Each structure stands twice: as C-alpha cells, then as structure tokens.
C-alpha cells in the first residue's frame, strides 16, 4: 500500500486534534465483516495520545468540543499541512510505535484474506496532532520502516501495513479502510491485520465488542458515542457495518481487498482522505482535494452518533446521528452504484484483454502464415536452383563423360554404356516412373532382400553407403557401420538429391528415351549387359545388394542385363557365388590395374560374369555408387550416395532412386559419362576399396551377393562413387575420399607429426579448434631433442645452425686440438684422424666395382678430368702392372729387411702410419699377433687370387704376409674397429685410391722405416724415383682425404684403388671377415681379376715401396718426423676455417641480436616521436583553444561591462557596442 500513502494529499479526517497532537484511540470499532469497519471494540490497545488528551477532560462533551475545534482547524490548516504528512500507512502500521505505548498496534492490515472480519477488532487510532504525527511518523517509519515509508500521522487512512501489502494480501486501500472517523482513526488502526494478532484488539466477536473489552482506556479515550449499545444502531452493530452496509460505505475494492492492490484499482490514493469525507461535510479548505464521490467516503459509520459539536465542520459531523442514517443509506447506494460501475469496468477490461489476446493470436497466425509462405517460396527457389544445377551438372556430366569415356571403356562399351545410360536415363524416367514402380517393386523385392542385408550389421543401407566410402563393400562389411553413420548423415541430402534426380531423370527421359533405347541396345551389346538400363539402375541398387556386380558391374558388370533398363532381375543375380569380397569384380580394382586390365577384366568378367558376378556385383554396387559421378552427383555424390543408401533403405524409393540415382546420377552427367564415371568411380572405388566401401559396400555387397535380393546393394554401388566423383565446380573427376579415410590419414599424419589426433566420426571444422588447442598444448611441451630429429637438423643446417650439443662437441674438439698443438709440436695424426674421423684408408678400400668396370664407365673421361683437378692421375692397367712389378722388386729386396724390421716397424708404425696409429699402437701389436693370422689368411687367400704369375705371387705372399702382419695387425685392427663404424664407406671413396695404397704403403713404409737399413743398399735412382712418387701419392692422398668425400675420385679411384685395394690388407681383411661384395673383384675368381689385381698389387706395392722409400728416407733423416703430408696442412686449414665459421656464427648471432634490438629501439623511437608530435599538436590545440576562450571571455567581459551603462538601450538594441 505504499502507493497509497497519501501523506501529502490525504487530509486526515482525524486532523481534528491537530493542536493536541494527541491521538484519541477509539476503541477499535469492531470491524464489521469489513475489516475496515470500525466498531468501537473498546480495545484499549489503540489508545493514543488523543486518548490521553481526552482522559483529562473526562467530560465527554469537553473532549468533543476540543475535538471539534481541532477538527475545524485541521481541516483547513492541518488537513492541508498535516494531512500530507500523515496519511502514510507506514505510520499507521507502525502503530506499535505510533500508538503511543499503548498497545502494540502492529500494523493493522486488513487481512489479505479478504474482508473477512479480522479476528481482532481493528483499533482505530486517532492521531490528529501534527506533532504526534511527526513523532509517530518517525517512529513508525523506523518501526514500520519496512512498511510504507510515508510516515504520516496515523490517519484515517487505513493503510494496511505495507508488510501486508507486500505479503501480497490485497491491501485495503486506505480510503476504504480509513473510515472517515472524525477522530482521525487511522485506518491502520481500523484495519487489523489478521497477521498481527498481537494487537490486543480484543474482539472475539467481530461485530460486537464484549463489554469487558471496554477498558479504561476505552472509556477514557475519546468516544464520540457512548459505549452503551443503545448508542449504536442496533442494525449496525456498533459500527459494525454489516456486510451490506460495509459495502455501501466502502467501495467494493475496499471491502474485499482487491486482488490487485494495484493503484488502478484503488481509489486514487491521493484523494483517499478527501474521499473519505462524505460530500455531506463541507470541505472548508478550498485547496483541499475535492471530496470524492460519497461512495468514496465511507466515513460515516452509520451506527455511530457523533456529538453535534463534532458535526459542525468536522467530519465528525458526518457521523452525527442525524446524518448517520442518511449517509449510511446514501453511502450504501453510492457504494452499490460504484460497485456496479466497477464491475462494469472490470468486465470491460477483461473483454478488452480478451480482444487484445485475440488480436495477438491473429497476428501470430498471420506471421506464421507469412513464414510459411516465405518458406514455400524458399523451397520453390531452391527447387529452381536445384533444377538448374542439375541441368548444369547433367551437361557437365555429359561433357565429362564424353571426355572420360574413352579412357575408361572401350569405345564400344562406352557407346553401349552411353546408350545404355541414356536409355537408362530415359528409362529411368520411364522406369522411374515405370521403373520407379519397378524399382519400388524392386525395392519391395529388395526390401525383403534387405533381410539378407542383415549381413550388414546395420541393415541400413548406409552400410552399403559406407561402401560408398570404399568400393570394397565386400570387405567392408564390418566397417560398414562407421560408414553407415556417415552415410546416414548424408542420407537425407541424398534423398533430396535423389528426388531431384528422379525429376531430372524424367525430364531427360523424355528427351532421351529414344536415344537411350538405342544406346541401351548398343550398351547391352557392348557390355553384354543384359540388364535393362533403368531397371538395372533400380536393380543396381537392389541387385547391387543382390548382385552388386551386375548392378553396376560397371559397364563390365554385364551379368545382369537386368540392371540397366529392366526391372530388377527376377532371379537374384547369380547367387553371389563369387560373393567372396575378394572375388567381387571391383571395377575399381580393374581400373586400378589399368583401364586395359580392367577392361579386359570387365570383359572377362563379363565373359564369366557368373563367376565374377557376385563379386563383381559387390564391386559393381560400388560402381553403382559411382554413378554419383554425374556432375551433380559428383557434387552431391556424397549426398546422393547417402540418399542412395537411404533409398536402399527405403526399399521402394530406393530402387527408383537407386536406379534413378545411380542411373540418373550418371544419367545426369550423361549415360556415357555415367559409365565413364562408373568406370572411374569403379577405379577409384576399387582403389578406394579401402575400408569405407569395403565396409559398407562389403556389407551391402557381400550381403548382396550373399543375399541376392538384398536391396542394400544399391548403396554399395553408391560406394564406388566415393572413388571418383565428377566435381561440378572443378569440372573434372576428383577422387572421392571417405571421411573415414580422411580421418585415418589425419590420424596417421598426426602420429607422424607427433600430435595427438582422436578419430572422431563426427570430425568437422569445429574439431579443428580442439586439434589446434591440442597442438598448442603439444607445442608447449619440451620439443623433441634436436639431435634425434634429423628433419630439424637438416632444417637448421639451411641456416648454418647446429645443435648445442654439436656445438659443444666442436668446441671441445677445438680445445683438444689447441691443447695438442701446444703440447706436441706436430699434431698427432691419429687424434686428428679420429677427430676428423677420416676413416683409415684401409676402411675405404673395399669397392663394388672392378677396375675394368670403372675404366669402362660411361663418364670415365670426365672422372679422369676431375682427378686432374686434384693433381691425381688415372693409372691404366699397364702402368699399374709396371708399378706393381717395381713394387715386387722392391719388396723382394725389402722382405729380408722386413722380417727383421717387423718389430721395429711395429713400434714405429703407430706413430708413423696414421692409419695404423689410428688403431691403438698397443692394440696393433697385440692385434698383430692375434689378427695376423686372419690378415695373413685373408691376404693369402686374396693373394692367390690376385697374385700375378710366379714372381708376383711369391713376392706377394711373403710381402703380403709380412705386410699383413704389420699392417693388418695395425691397419686391420684399425680397420676392423673402424670399418664397422661405417667409416668404410667414407674412406672408401676418399681413400679408395690414396688410402689403399697408403694402407699397404704405410705398413710397408713403417717396416721400412723401422729397418731403413734394408733400403740403403737399394739403388739410389730407384729410391729417388720412388720417393718422388710416394711424395706425390701422399699429396694425392691428402687431397683425396680432404676431398675424399668427393665421390668423384671414387669413380676413378675406385678403379685404381680397386685394384690396389684388393691388394690392400684392409681389403684382404675385409674379405676374410666378410668378403665385401667385390673388392675390386677380389672376390672374383683370381683369373678374372688377375690382371687388374696384379696391377693393383703392383701399383700398391709400388706406391708402398715408394712411400716406404720416402718414409725410409725421411725417417733416416728424421725418423720421428710426423709429417703427414698435405693432409696435416689441410687439417689445420680445415680447423682454421671451422674456427672462423664458429666465430662468424657467434658474431652473426650477436649481430642478429643487436639488429633485433636496434629494430625494436628504432620502433620505440618512432613511437616516441609520434607521441611527441601528437603531444605537440595537442599543445598547439590547447594553446589555440585557450586563446579562443580568452578572446570569448574578453568579448563577454566587454559585453557585460558595457550593457550596464546603456542597459535600456542595450536591451533594445542588442549587445551594446
């Protein structure tokens, strides 16, 4: 009822005691049923200040007089002034607070229940005084702060305490409640909230106040009427308005708290108080609100007699007995009238609302209708588009088919197919119409067949459709379910598509029926397709299931002629004897094999369709699917395929659809294209046969083959489609890839790339996000170790970068080198070698080519030229032989010395021969003994093979054995240890040439070195010659080693080296170990090899000897000298380069860092300069703004100053100048 606080407006009738500010508590009149009816129930509870005031003047009359006076005043002054403050229900409610200390008044609210009489008599508090009101108001506010905020005086306004209102009980509008008690009983006092029984309003009987209730307070309190019952009209119990009266007094809304305590239903609150005044009372204050219609004043309690004093201007007058009767009647009538009007208005309102609702509904319906129409239009448009698209697709398909046909089918077949397709097409319409019926029949037939389909785990053709995915429907049985899901998704689309296809088919049919017939004949002839094109199509589906092969058989599947035009074969295609999925003739596989093969196969298949039929059928269904090739199909192929499966599922439609869709699909493209497509698809499908079709198709088809009639087959044909579909947009066939395959591929990729990919059938773009998130996640994890990822290393190498580990290794190497260099004047070759990891020459010795092969290689000359770049020369067989002879001589001479020198050479060899030293010297010695045998054996075995006649052989065996003892022991060991490492290959090339010689030479030289004496006797000339050669060779070797990597040398070297190689112990050893394939033909029969080997030996020995010579000489002069020939120089240079590179890298990285820094700084600088510029411009703006404002100010000042002087004139003329 907050709304009702009329503080401002309602003059409280009770203003009477304005001056006193005391509240007279009228014993609550027992409320008549009307809650509000106030009957003096004599509950002292409400005694209020007034009562206190009254008490002193025990004389009733005095009290009345006073009241009257006050009433007069208040009406004018107080009403206007106070009433406003007072009428707040809040006050009333806060009756506990407001009713001074008497009874907790508890807001008295009319029980929401209705106007049932509150159990407790309402207490009427008269709070006429402003002060009191003020106080009360505040109190009440605190008290009832929750209730209405208007803390008015307790007024007549009966404002049920807000709580009640809040509670939702209809609050009785204050005007209703507020009885216009002259005493300013506040309605709250009147209305008692049943909820606040605490009010001690004792009133067991509503209407009657038991005498006992009359308390002292009551007596003392201002009572305009005697307590005695006689004062009350008997008819109206004390004030109890019987319901009728109450009704009269109170507006119905008051009586029954209106369900909507909505202001609309209450009398205007603002006028409440005035309303309470009955028209009979004069309303003195002109400004006061106009009295409301009498009905509004339910003031006069008819039964109450107000003392005449009160009646004067005070509202009390109303209550005077004189008026009470009249007013009661009048009020009653008014009330009734008003109630009538209210009811009328209510009804009106309801009707209004109904009408509104009707209109709303109407509008809704309108909207819906609009939407419907819109939708219809949309559909129309779509259909139009579809038709156009189909048209286009068909044209494209035809073109494509024409282009493709040749490639796929033999011309005859193509024509046949084309005719067939056309016919099919035409027939499709016919058939679809007729055939459709047939197909439907087929479908019906196939429907039963589907039972067979059970094979497919899910009978749903989807499975077949899955076949869609791959052609091997046959194989795919299991997977079909997955496929099925996919297919199912697409099925709806496909169905739509099929319907469209059917329509198109019919149109085309008309156009092409003649052609199609002719074509069909041709087709049948060509394809041996007994299947009628259209029915075939229809059948395809059904038959597909039944006999996938015939269905599509591609053109090849002629088995069932039924397919193409005719109704589904009555007899299921040959029992799928060939049901074996593998057996299925997979056009795709055929295609894959090659068109030719396929064609042949098709033909052969056709030839023995019986055998292949079942399988073929299975495959064919795939093919059928292929029909999807039509451009439209291609486009919609997937959709179609699904629909096809759907069709299959929906047996009747499917067949037509099958036929139609398959047929028509190809049909769209054009029969030829369709066939071509078929073939293509067959190929693709077969190619794809993979799981999808296999799964679906397999099911469908297997089941088909197994169950000849199974209608699911048609879907299978769809499957083939997956392989290739004609892409309308690309205008070319494109491979149709099943989602499963895609999924699979993605998963595989993901595995390879190292991220996790979950196979999710429903994979779609939205999953991309997840995958991306996952990738992010993975990216945040520690990366693969660089060193273990060759890809990464390769990538880094592009930028000249390497991994930290490698860098550290390099640095460590450098450090080691430096230390070594500092420690020993000359770097120790072995370390260098190992560091360089230059395989010991021996390792490199083995080669696959024989010298002859190498000499005969096509680019032999080029290779020779290449060698010359490194100052190397190719040695012809003759030269080699000469050299070898020389070596033999030298060896023979050396042998004696060698045996003696062996020990020395062993000691020396480690330091002398890099190769030997490579393997640890100690080991070498040990190994000499241990390995000698092996080496020797090897050398012996090799030697015989390679040995030259007599002399060579003799010399060699001894020498070899010796050499092997030395070299093999050291070299072999080194080699053995190294070779496994795989250095062999490396060294092979570099060393092939130089190394091989070196190998042997080294040992020889060592031995020689050890016993240089044996050489002394040697002829000086020869020695010089050999020395030169050895120097030459060592240089070459060094070069080779450095450029060893260069395979080029290998070619020629290989030849040369091969020969020499096989002489090399390393080779021998390797041969003994695991004879390398052809160590330069070492393994070849000695005879074959004899020439070159001998040469090799000669050359090697020669080299060796030369080197020995050289070494010997060197060693004689400086036995300990470790000069490694150019190699060392190269090594040093290499290191130098590397260091430089490292340095460069470091500098580059620093440079890069600096550049980046510089860049970022320059950016910042730029930004700063921008901001500075901005600030400057702003400053400029501010300055100009300030100037402008200043100017304006000055102007204003002028204006303001001048006008004062010439004001009048200024006024008239505008601003004075």
UniProtKB/Swiss-Prot annotation:
Gene Ontology annotations of biological process type: gene expression; in utero embryonic development; placenta development
Basic and acidic residues: bias regions: 331-385, 551-561, 633-645
Give a Pfam family name: DUF3736
| Species | Homo sapiens (Human)
* PTM sites of type Phosphoserine: 10, 84, 95, 766, 826, 828, 857, 909, 1101
Record-listed N6-acetyllysine modification sites: 496, 739
Write down which residues bear the modification named Asymmetric dimethylarginine: 305
List residues modified as Phosphothreonine.
433, 907
Biased composition of type Pro residues is found at: 711-720
Subunit structure and binding partners:
May be a component of a BHC histone deacetylase complex that contains HDAC1, HDAC2, HMG20B/BRAF35, KDM1A, RCOR1/CoREST, PHF21A/BHC80, ZMYM2, ZNF217, ZMYM3, GSE1 and GTF2I.
Where does this protein have compositionally biased stretches of type Polar residues? 15-33, 831-840, 847-858, 1068-1085
- Gene symbol here is GSE1
Which intervals carry biased composition (Low complexity)? 43-63, 76-89, 103-114, 450-465
The keyword Transmembrane helix appears for this protein: no
Q: Where is the composition biased (Acidic residues)?
A: 1099-1117
Keywords in UniProt for this one? Answer: Acetylation, Coiled coil, Methylation, Phosphoprotein
Task: Report whether Phosphoprotein shows up as a keyword of the record.
Answer: yes
What are the coiled-coil residue ranges?
A: 321-403, 1127-1201
Q: Give the residue range of the signal peptide.
A: none
Q: What is the effect of changing residue 627 to W?
A: In a colorectal cancer sample; somatic mutation
Q: Where is this region: Disordered?
A: 1-155, 324-385, 418-465, 526-579, 633-675, 699-720, 807-858, 903-930, 948-981, 1068-1122
Q: Where is this chain compositionally biased, Basic residues type?
A: 813-822
Its induction, per UniProt? Answer: Negatively regulated by miR-489-5p.
Q: What is the official name of this protein in its record?
A: Genetic suppressor element 1
């Amino acid at each position: 009822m907050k709304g009702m606080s009329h503080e401002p407006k309602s003059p409280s009738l009770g203003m009477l005691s304005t001056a006193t500010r005391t509240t007279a508590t009228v014993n609550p009149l027992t409320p008549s049923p009307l809650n509000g009816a106030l009957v003096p129930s004599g509950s002292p509870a409400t005694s209020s200040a007034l009562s206190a005031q009254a008490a002193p003047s025990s004389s009733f009359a005095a009290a009345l007089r006073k009241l009257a006076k006050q009433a007069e005043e208040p009406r004018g002054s107080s009403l206007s002034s106070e009433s406003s403050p007072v009428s707040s229900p809040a006050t009333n409610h806060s009756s506990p607070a407001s009713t001074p200390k008497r009874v907790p008044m508890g807001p008295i609210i009319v029980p929401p229940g209705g106007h049932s009489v509150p159990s407790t008599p309402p207490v009427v508090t008269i709070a006429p005084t402003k002060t009191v009101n003020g106080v009360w108001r505040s109190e009440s506010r605190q008290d009832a702060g929750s209730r209405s905020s208007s803390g008015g005086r307790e007024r007549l306004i009966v404002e049920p305490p807000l709580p009640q209102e809040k509670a939702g009980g209809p609050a009785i509008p204050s005007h209703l409640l507020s009885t216009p008690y002259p005493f300013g009983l506040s309605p709250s006092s009147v209305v008692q909230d049943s909820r606040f029984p605490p009010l001690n309003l004792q009133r067991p009987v509503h209407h009657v106040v038991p005498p006992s209730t009359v308390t002292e307070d009551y007596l003392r309190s201002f009572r305009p009427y005697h307590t005695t019952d006689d004062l009350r009209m008997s008819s109206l119990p004390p004030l109890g308005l019987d319901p009728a009266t109450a009704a009269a007094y109170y507006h119905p809304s008051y009586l029954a708290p209106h369900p909507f305590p909505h202001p609309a239903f209450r009398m205007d609150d603002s006028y409440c108080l005035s309303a309470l005044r009955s028209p009979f009372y004069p309303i003195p204050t002109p400004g006061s609100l106009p009295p409301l219609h009498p009905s509004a004043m339910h003031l006069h309690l008819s039964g109450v007699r107000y003392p005449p004093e009160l009646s004067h201007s005070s509202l009390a007058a109303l209550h005077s007995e004189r008026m009470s009767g009249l007013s009661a009647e009048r009020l009653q009538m008014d009330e009734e009238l008003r109630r009538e009007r209210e009811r009328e208005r209510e009804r009106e309102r309801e009707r209004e609302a109904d009408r509104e609702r009707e209109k709303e509904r109407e509008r809704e319906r309108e909207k819906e209708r609009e939407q419907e129409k819109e939708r219809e239009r949309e559909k129309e448009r779509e259909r139009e588009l579809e038709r156009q698209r189909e048209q286009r697709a068909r044209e494209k398909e035809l073109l494509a088919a024409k282009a493709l046909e040749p490639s796929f089918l033999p011309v005859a077949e193509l024509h046949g197919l084309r005719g067939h397709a056309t016919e099919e097409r035409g027939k499709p319409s016919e058939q679809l119409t007729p055939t459709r019926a047939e197909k439907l029949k087929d479908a019906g037939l196939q429907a039963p067949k589907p039972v067979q389909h059970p094979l497919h785990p899910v009978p749903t053709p989807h499975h077949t459709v899955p076949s869609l995915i791959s052609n091997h429907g046959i194989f795919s049985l299991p997977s079909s379910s997955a496929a099925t899901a996919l297919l199912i998704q697409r099925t709806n689309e496909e169905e739509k598509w099929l319907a469209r296809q059917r329509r198109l088919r019919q149109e085309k049919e008309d156009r092409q029926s003649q052609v199609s017939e002719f074509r069909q004949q041709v087709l049948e002839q060509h394809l041996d397709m007994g299947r009628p094109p259209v029915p075939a199509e229809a059948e395809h589906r059904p038959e597909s299931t039944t006999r996938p092969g015939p269905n599509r058989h591609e053109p090849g599947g002629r088995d069932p002629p039924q397919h193409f035009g005719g109704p589904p074969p009555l007899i299921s295609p040959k029992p799928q004897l060939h049901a074996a999925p593998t057996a299925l003739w997979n056009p795709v596989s055929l295609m894959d094999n090659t068109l030719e093969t396929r064609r042949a196969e098709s033909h052969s298949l056709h030839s023995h369709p019986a055998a292949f039929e079942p399988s073929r059928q299975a495959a064919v269904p795939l093919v059928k699917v292929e029909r999807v090739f039509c451009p439209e199909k291609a486009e919609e192929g997937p959709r179609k395929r699904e629909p096809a499966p759907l069709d299959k599922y929906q047996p009747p439609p499917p067949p037509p659809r099958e036929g139609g869709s398959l047929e028509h699909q190809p049909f769209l493209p054009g029969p030829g294209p369709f066939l071509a497509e078929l073939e293509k698809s067959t190929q693709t499908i077969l190619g794809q046969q993979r799981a999808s079709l296999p799964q679906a198709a397999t099911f469908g088809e297997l089941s088909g083959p197994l169950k000849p009639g199974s209608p699911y087959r048609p879907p299978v044909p769809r499957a083939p489609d997956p392989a290739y579909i004609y892409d309308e947009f690309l205008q070319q066939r494109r491979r149709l890839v099943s989602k499963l395959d895609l999924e699979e591929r993605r998963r595989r990729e993901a595995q390879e790339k190292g991220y996790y990919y979950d196979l999710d059938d429903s994979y779609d773009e939205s999953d991309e996000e997840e995958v991306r998130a996952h990738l992010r996640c993975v990216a945040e994890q520690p990366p693969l170790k660089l060193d273990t990822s060759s890809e990464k290393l390769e990538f880094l190498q592009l930028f000249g970068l390497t991994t930290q580990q490698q860098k550290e290794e390099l640095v460590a190497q450098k450090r080691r080198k430096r230390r070594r260099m500092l420690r020993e004047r000359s770097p120790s070759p072995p370390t260098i070698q190992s560091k360089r990891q230059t395989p010991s020459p021996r390792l490199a010795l083995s080669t696959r080519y024989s010298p002859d092969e190498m000499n005969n290689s096509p680019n032999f000359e080029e290779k020779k030229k290449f060698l010359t770049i490194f100052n190397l020369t190719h040695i012809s067989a003759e030269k080699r032989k000469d050299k070898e002879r020389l070596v033999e001589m030298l060896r023979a001479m050396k042998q004696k010395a060698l045996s003696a020198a062996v020990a020395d050479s062993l000691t020396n060899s480690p330091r002398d021969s890099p190769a030997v030293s490579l393997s640890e010297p100690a080991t070498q010695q040990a190994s000499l003994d241990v390995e000698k045998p092996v080496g020797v054996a090897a050398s012996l075995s090799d030697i015989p093979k390679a040995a030259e006649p007599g002399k060579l052989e003799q010399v060699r065996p001894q020498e070899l054995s010796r050499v092997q003892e030395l070299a093999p022991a050291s070299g072999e060991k080194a080699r053995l240890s190294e070779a496994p490492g795989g250095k062999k290959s490396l060294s092979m090339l570099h060393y092939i040439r130089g190394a091989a010689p070196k190998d042997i030479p080294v040992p020889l030289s060592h031995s020689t070195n050890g016993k240089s004496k044996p050489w002394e006797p040697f002829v000086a000339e020869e020695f010089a010659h050999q020395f030169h050669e050895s120097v030459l060779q060592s240089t070459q070797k060094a070069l080779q080693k450095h450029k060893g990597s260069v395979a080029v040398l290998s070619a020629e070297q290989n030849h040369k080296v091969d020969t020499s190689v096989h002489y090399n112990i390393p080779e021998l050893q390797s041969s003994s170990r695991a004879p390398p394939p052809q160590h330069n033909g070492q393994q070849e029969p000695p005879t074959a090899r004899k020439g070159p080997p001998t040469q090799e030996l000669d050359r090697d020995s020669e080299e060796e000897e030369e080197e020995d010579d050289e070494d010997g000489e060197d060693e004689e002069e400086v036995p300990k000298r470790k000069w490694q020939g150019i190699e060392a120089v190269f090594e040093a240079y290499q290191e130098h380069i590397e260091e430089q590179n490292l340095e460069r890298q470091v500098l580059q990285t620093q440079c890069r860092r600096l550049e980046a820094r510089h860049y970022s700084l320059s950016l910042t600088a730029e930004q700063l300069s921008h901001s500075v510029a901005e600030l400057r411009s702003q400053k400029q703006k501010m300055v100009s703004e300030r100037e402008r404002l200043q100017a304006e100010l000055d102007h204003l000042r002028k204006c303001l100053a001048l006008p004062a002087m010439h004001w009048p004139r200024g006024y008239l003329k505008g601003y004075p100048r």
